[in-house]
Amino acid sequence: YAKTYAVPKGKNAVWRNRELFAQVFGYAMPETQVFGLTVPEAGRLKNLEQPYYVALHATSRDSKLWPVENWRALLQKLNEEQQCNVYLPWGNEAEKARAEQIADGLPFAIVCDKMNLLQAAYLLKHAVGIIGVDTGLLHLANALEKPVVGIYTDTDPIKTGVQVSAVAKNLGNIGQIPTADLVYQTLMDCVAADEGSKVV
């Protein structure tokens, strides 16, 4: 611990960690945000009904959750407008119960079976888009270069948000809860930008 490195404040945690690693290992941090992640077929999930979106509804503390009624309104709008399914992964029994509460009476909202991290990565990689609260899987979806919308209710996305790009946006802030309509429209903008980038 004899050597220290100065990392500028005012950037989010991912950027600051990238900058720190660049200094420690002596390279210039690339301006682009391409992480180059791939998901091995070993994580393959069977019977995923395409097209689908993923709702990352669970997080480390209750103050970072988005209200169940907002999730339900968003999922209904996604299904009505996009004719799609929405998968809800979970990691423990409390998260499973929340997923079941969100999906109750919505046949297109599918509570996932328990899965490992590789399977979760596969689910994210093959989704049209991902919506999520402040959680690690949201950052994984961002690193996989998927269309993502981060929902922040108790943390500042400037510090902990996804890496913003044409296909990745943050909404909300401490005490600022975004509406389902705003999340939907922002997600559609991200999906459109992703589809536009694939046109040759």
Where does each model-flagged region fall?
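Catalytic machinery of carbohydrate-active enzymes
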Residues: Y1-V200
